Amino acid sequence: MATRVLVIDDEAPIRLLCRVNLEAEGMEVLEAADGPSGLATARAETPDVILLDVMMPGLDGWRVAEELLDDARTQGIPIVFLTARAELRDRARGIDLGGVDYVTKPFNPVELAPLVRSLLERVGAGERDDVRREKLTELRSLLERE
């Protein structure tokens, strides 16, 4: 069965870029153009991974992540924030909100499939909390240097 990735981003070109590159690697891609439809799709389809933009009109990515974590049906789905917000504090917030990785735009779309595969291998091995802890430690170290 193909890995299912839900891309929640209000920018159609970003969703298309993700779709083309992930489908080329044999993954199934679901799309949502805003927070509410992303939540509905996540709850109905239970994807393996969610790529989530932060800056969306209405319900932003931070709130979407909070709602996903509060819902028993979706709280186990790994979230990768995919956003233009590159500040270290934003990255730390994303990980604090349950994200397992944080990719800043612009990004190399060819790197998405290997990222998703690696993430699923680690999460499947029960290392989700380890992945998040590593990211938080790295980000806190960088924040202390500022």
Model regions and ranges:
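CheY-like receiver
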Residues: V123-E146
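Short hydrophobic/Thr-rich beta-strand motif most characteristic of the beta2 strand and flanking loop
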Residues: G26-A33, T41
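Charged docking surfaces used in two-component/phosphorelay signaling
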Residues: L16-A24
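Short, glycine/charged-rich "phosphate-handling" switch motifs in NTP-dependent
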Residues: V100
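Active-site beta3 strand of CheY-like receiver
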Residues: E45-L51
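Receiver (REC) domain active-site loop signature in two-component systems and cognate sites
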Residues: M56
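C-terminal output helix
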Residues: F107-V116
